[in-house]
Amino acid sequence: PGPTLHVRQGTEVVVNAANDTDLETTVHWHGLRLDNRFDGTHHTQDPIETGGAFGYRISFPDPGVYWYHPHIRQDYGQEMGLYGTIVVEPTDPHYWPPVNREITLTLDDILLTDGAVAPFSRTRTTHTAMGRFGDVLLVNGEPDLTLAAHAGEVVRLYLVNTANTRVFNVAIPGARIKLVAGDSGRYEREEFVQSDVLAPTERVV
């Protein structure tokens, strides 16, 4: 996946997206409230042709976790790793409950054939929904990512399901999980859970 972007609430940036792939594309800023002409979805802009570029003016009015990805041929683009997360840090220092540290995790899967990414159709999307089920699970692009925490340490996890089709059921055996936010921001009531189910494109904190 691409890099995690950390920005302050209220910031505005310009992202110059260059298309070096062999298919037309756009960049969609998933969950962000912004000017429609920069949203990157179908019919809000012309596709970025191969070798072309487009400048996106992006605002970040709300704290939370978001992500960016293609909105043309998502099945191809996302499977090839064209996505990344965005963490919008709140201006209110008390917006989030206190923690010792933060980690951003993208959940994905990929379909391999003979050790390589299974081929795609160039003319139509392949398999279920807008993508296909993979046979290798990935966290931050890694098939065997290992993380460690100290006893008593409180870690804020920004979780994003970037898979085309797969639903993930996330649990951490031996640790307490508290849900504090989702797609629409901070929850009014925090809740301890044994696990949490994330549908494709869903985000939780």
Regions found by a protein language model. Give the residues of each.
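Short, conserved beta-strand segments of beta-strand-rich sandwich/propeller modules, principally
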Residues: 14, 65-67, 156
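Solvent-exposed, conformationally flexible loop/turn segments
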Residues: 8-10, 49-53, 100, 152, ...
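A long-range scaffold signal marking pre-active-site subdomains of enzyme folds
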Residues: 1-32, 100, 163
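Conserved, well-structured core segments that form or line functional sites
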Residues: 103-105, 109-125
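Extracellular/periplasmic metallocenter environments
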Residues: 21-25, 32-34, 39-94, 193-205
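Histidine- and aromatic-rich segments of cupredoxin/plastocyanin-like copper-binding domains
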Residues: 36-49, 122-205
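Short, solvent-exposed loop/turn elements at domain surfaces
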Residues: 16, 24-27, 36, 96, ...
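Low-complexity, Pro/Ser/Thr- and charge-rich linker/hinge segments at domain boundaries
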Residues: 89-104, 114-115
